[in-house]
Amino acid sequence: KGVEIVIHYNKSKAKAEKLKKELSTNDTKVYLVKGDLSIENDVIKIIKFAKSKLQYFDCLINNASLFENDKLENFNTDSWGKHLRTNLRTPALLSKEFAKNIKSKNNNIINIIDQRVFKLTPYFFSYTISKTGLYTLTKTSAMSLAPNIRVNGIAPGPTIKNKRQSE
């Protein structure tokens, strides 16, 4: 039966449109919404948009994140705050609103964490702190929202080769 999906993007409009095209088959409807997850008003706009398009929510995937390299010795409060807002506060806000808009049982929240929360290093300080917070949010949300909502985290290792990695 028909599936409806809301996909958020910030700077990757072309990739979001490509994904929409790939997913828009048969009875699947895909809606795109732009917003900066570090800005609370944008998050509120995304929530309102999703509510306007979907009758109810049954799955939330918190996948977006900010990933910048810093260390305790050189981090700045702007980067620290943006990491916490994007990687921790926004998933908390989205999870709260998700829980208010479910129809029945068997709902899911999936938080994409990072293997770094289990293998700590001094690198990517702000990112790692925000993702360890998301790990804790995942565990406490699972306890709070059960049994109607399952909350799980996925902690992958590197998934995309970047300029700091070799073949």
Predicted regions and their residues:
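A glycine/serine/threonine-rich, flexible loop-to-helix segment
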Residues: E17, P156-E167
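Conserved NAD(P)H cofactor-binding loop of Rossmann-fold oxidoreductase domains
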Residues: N63-E68
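Catalytic loop of short-chain dehydrogenase/reductase
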Residues: N108-A146, P158-K161
